[in-house]
Amino acid sequence: MKKYVGLAALLAAAPLYAADLVNHADNRPASLDTGAQKRVQVVNVWATWCVPCRREMPALSQWYAAEKRQRRGVRVEMAGVALDKPADVNRFLQSVPVRYPILRYTGNDSTAWMHSLGNPTGALPFTVIRAPACGNYRKTLLGEVSPQQLTQAVEAAAAQCRAG
């Protein structure tokens, strides 16, 4: 029975690491897997047609640039995941450049993929702060996020990493 519970947990997490992400810059396969590293990961899921997504991205980019200079004893990484076609993402990023990597979701069911990240509704924008190697910390933020919300969630995740 224990073996099946472990397998079920592994399968439940599988969509998170499936080959449905590519790096927008070079179209190579990408992953949100942080491995055993004690890192805090901020993942912002967005689309070019989503007005709140477009509005929050400049602030997210500025927050990340400042966050990279902070020293919390734990590395903070950020990625944006676009639910769009490459040409649409290119056009958007030309007008609103960001300072963090942009990935694209290429799978067939973005709603199920977002559910696997903790988004119960599939609504955008959606941000998740994760620290899988630090007690599997996860905080989900639905809707437009503020730099203050991100800082609070990252500080909580970093504290858990330092404690563990």
State what each model feature region is:
Residues A159-G164:
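Non-globular targeting/processing and membrane-anchoring segments
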Residues A19-Q41:
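A short beta-strand-turn-helix
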Residues R55-P97, N108-W113:
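Structural microenvironment flanking redox-active thiols in thiol-disulfide oxidoreductases
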Residues V96-V98, Y105-E155:
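Thiol/disulfide oxidoreductase modules built on the thioredoxin-like
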Residues A13-A18:
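N-terminal signal peptide c-region/cleavage motif recognized by signal peptidases
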